[in-house]
C-alpha cells in the first residue's frame, strides 16, 4: 500500500471534515483515489495566471487556456490578469528577486508534501514565494479574502486558513535544506482590480513549526490507518447544496436531494 503524505490542502480538508464542513467521501476520492475535480472558473483563472508567471503546469498536467471572445481577444477578466502579469514582472524586477526554480516539489519530509510556486534568491537569502489570485483582496470576512485586518489576530481560524501554507512550507524547507524558518512570501493579485496587488511576508513562531510537525504526524497516521478504512456511511457528510455540485454526484450512494430534518429544542 502506498501511503499518502499530508499536504496543507489535505490537512485543511481533514479539519473541515472534523467540523462537518466537508464530506469524507470527497476527501478520499481526491487524495487517495486521485480522482480529478473540475476546477471552478476562479480556479481556472488562477491556474492560468500562475502558469503565465512561473511557466509551470498545474498538478493535472494540462496547459491552462484563457477565456477568449469570438474574435480571439482575451475576455475582460483575463485582460485584467494580463495587466497583473505586468505588475508581477515589475515586482520581480524592482525588488531584485532572482528566481531559482518554479514548481519545486519538496521530497525530504517523510510524511508531509508541498509544491512551491517559486524558490528565489532575495537579498542574498533563499526564499519561498507563493502566488495567490483573489476577488476579495481587501475583504477580511470572506474565507479567501486578503484584507489586512484579517491578520491582526493570527490565531483566528480565518487567518490560519491562509497562513497554514506558510507554516507547512517553512517546515518542508527545514527538512529539505536545513534552513530554519525560511523567509516566506505571499504575492496576492486581485482578479477584479488590475491595479491591486499585495505582498505579505509571513513570520512564524518556532514553537508553531514544532507543533505543526506533530500535527502532520497525527494527520498522517489518522488518514492512512483510520480515515480511509472507514465505511462510506461513516465518511459521508451529505448536505443538499454540496451534493448537488459534487463531482461524485452521479454514482454516490450517500448523496441527498432533499434537506435532512434537523430538530430544534426550545
Question: What are the language-model segments listed below?
Answer:
Residues 39, 75, 156-163, 168-266:
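Metal-dependent nuclease catalytic regions and adjoining charged, substrate-binding loops involved
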Residues 101-163:
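Non-catalytic protein-protein interaction segments used by genome-maintenance enzymes to assemble
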Residues 1, 125, 265-266:
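Short intrinsically disordered terminal tails
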Residues 1-116, 120:
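Metal-dependent nuclease catalytic cores that hydrolyze phosphodiester bonds in DNA/RNA
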Residues 11, 19-21, 134-135, 204-210:
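A short, sequence-level motif marking secondary-structure junctions
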Residues 53-57, 133-136, 174-178, 224:
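Hydrophobic/aromatic-lined pockets within catalytic cores
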Residues 93-95, 120-128, 173-182:
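Secondary-structure boundary elements
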Amino acid at each position: 500500500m502506498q501511503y499518502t503524505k499530508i499536504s496543507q490542502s489535505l490537512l485543511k480538508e481533514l479539519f473541515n471534515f472534523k467540523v462537518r464542513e466537508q464530506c469524507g467521501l470527497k476527501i478520499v476520492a481526491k487524495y487517495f483515489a486521485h480522482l480529478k475535480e473540475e476546477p471552478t472558473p476562479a480556479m481556472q483563472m488562477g491556474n492560468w495566471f500562475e502558469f503565465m508567471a512561473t511557466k509551470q503546469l498545474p498538478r493535472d498536467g494540462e496547459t491552462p487556456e484563457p477565456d477568449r471572445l469570438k474574435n480571439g481577444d482575451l475576455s475582460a477578466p483575463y485582460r485584467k490578469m494580463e495587466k497583473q502579469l505586468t505588475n508581477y514582472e515589475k515586482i520581480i524586477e524592482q525588488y531584485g528577486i532572482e528566481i531559482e526554480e518554479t514548481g519545486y516539489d519538496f521530497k525530504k519530509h517523510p510524511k508531509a508534501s508541498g509544491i512551491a510556486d517559486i524558490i528565489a534568491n532575495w537579498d542574498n537569502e533563499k526564499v519561498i514565494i507563493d502566488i495567490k489570485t483573489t476577488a476579495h483582496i481587501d475583504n477580511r470576512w470572506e474565507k479567501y479574502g486578503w484584507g489586512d485586518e484579517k491578520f491582526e489576530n493570527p490565531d483566528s481560524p480565518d487567518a490560519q486558513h491562509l497562513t497554514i501554507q506558510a507554516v507547512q512550507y517553512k517546515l518542508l524547507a527545514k527538512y529539505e535544506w536545513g534552513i530554519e524558518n525560511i523567509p516566506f512570501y505571499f504575492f496576492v493579485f486581485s482578479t477584479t482590480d488590475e491595479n491591486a496587488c499585495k505582498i505579505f511576508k509571513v513570520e512564524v513562531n518556532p514553537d508553531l513549526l514544532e507543533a505543526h510537525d506533530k500535527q502532520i504526524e497525527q494527520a498522517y497516521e489518522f488518514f492512512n490507518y483510520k480515515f480511509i478504512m472507514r465505511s462510506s456511511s461513516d465518511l459521508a457528510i451529505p448536505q443538499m447544496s454540496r451534493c448537488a455540485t459534487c463531482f461524485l454526484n452521479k454514482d454516490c450512494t450517500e448523496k441527498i436531494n432533499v434537506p435532512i430534518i434537523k430538530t430544534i429544542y426550545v
